[in-house]
UniProtKB/Swiss-Prot annotation:
GO terms for cellular component: plasma membrane; proton-transporting ATP synthase complex. It is a peripheral membrane protein. It is found in: Cell inner membrane. This is ATP synthase subunit delta. It comes from the Bacteria. The keyword RNA-binding does not apply. F-type ATPases have 2 components, F(1) - the catalytic core - and F(0) - the membrane proton channel. F(1) has five subunits: alpha(3), beta(3), gamma(1), delta(1), epsilon(1). F(0) has three main subunits: a(1), b(2) and c(10-14). The alpha and beta chains form an alternating ring which encloses part of the gamma chain. F(1) is attached to F(0) by a central stalk formed by the gamma and epsilon chains, while a peripheral stalk is formed by the delta and b chains. GO terms for molecular function: proton-transporting ATP synthase activity, rotational mechanism. Belongs to the ATPase delta chain family. It comes from Pectobacterium carotovorum subsp. carotovorum (strain PC1). F(1)F(0) ATP synthase produces ATP from ADP in the presence of a proton or sodium gradient. F-type ATPases consist of two structural domains, F(1) containing the extramembraneous catalytic core and F(0) containing the membrane proton channel, linked together by a central stalk and a peripheral stalk. During catalysis, ATP synthesis in the catalytic domain of F(1) is coupled via a rotary mechanism of the central stalk subunits to proton translocation. This protein is part of the stalk that links CF(0) to CF(1). It either transmits conformational changes from CF(0) to CF(1) or is implicated in proton conduction.
Length: 177
């Protein structure tokens, strides 16, 4: 998987730079998202792993995408097909999203709780995370009954576990040692 990250990075960077230059970040993110979904399709994945000529592969892929790709998007697909890189399209999308978030100084923050949080609670969490990370945050709320109570907050590789489940697990670790 880390090899996919390495392979995808230059394609994501090129697409991102082109999108910024042409003020088309939303359009490019949508094109990449659609292309990534197509690449994840089982039948397309089989086609990508088969012995199909790159030109035919690009034509088929572009035909499946239809009018979801503009000319520049089609060119990206052609280049990736020529280099046998279409299977990494989902990772290209992820890298593109990360580059965009860095440009916009935003970070995705996952907030996992046992119950739905109020707007006031969410705004307090957002304010605290913005202060801690020195960036704007976008909260992604998820409900997981296994946390019992409290919240688990994830931002990149940082995890703040304020859940009852987390406390019980830490207590069990202390008692076992």
């Amino acid at each position: 998987m880390s090899e996919f990250v390495t392979v995808a990075r230059p394609y994501a960077k090129a697409a991102f730079d082109f999108a910024v230059e042409n003020q088309a970040l939303d359009r490019w993110q949508n094109m990449l998202a659609f292309s990534a979904e197509v690449a994840r399709n089982e039948q397309i994945a089989e086609l990508l792993s088969g012995a199909v000529a790159p030109i035919e592969l690009a034509k088929t892929f572009i035909a499946v995408c239809g009018d979801q790709l503009d000319e520049a998007g089609q060119n990206l697909i052609k280049v990736m097909a020529e280099n046998g890189r279409l299977p990494v399209l989902p990772e290209v999308l992820e890298q593109f999203i990360q580059l965009r978030a860095a440009l916009e100084s935003t970070v995705d923050v996952d907030v996992i709780s046992a119950n739905t949080l109020s707007e006031q609670q969410l705004s307090k969490i957002a304010a605290a995370m913005e202060k801690r990370l020195s960036r704007k945050v976008k909260l992604n709320c998820k409900i997981d009954k296994s946390v019992m109570a409290g919240v688990v907050i994830r931002a990149g590789d940082m995890v703040i576990d304020g859940s009852i489940r987390g406390r019980l697990e830490r207590l069990a670790d202390v008692l076992q040692s």
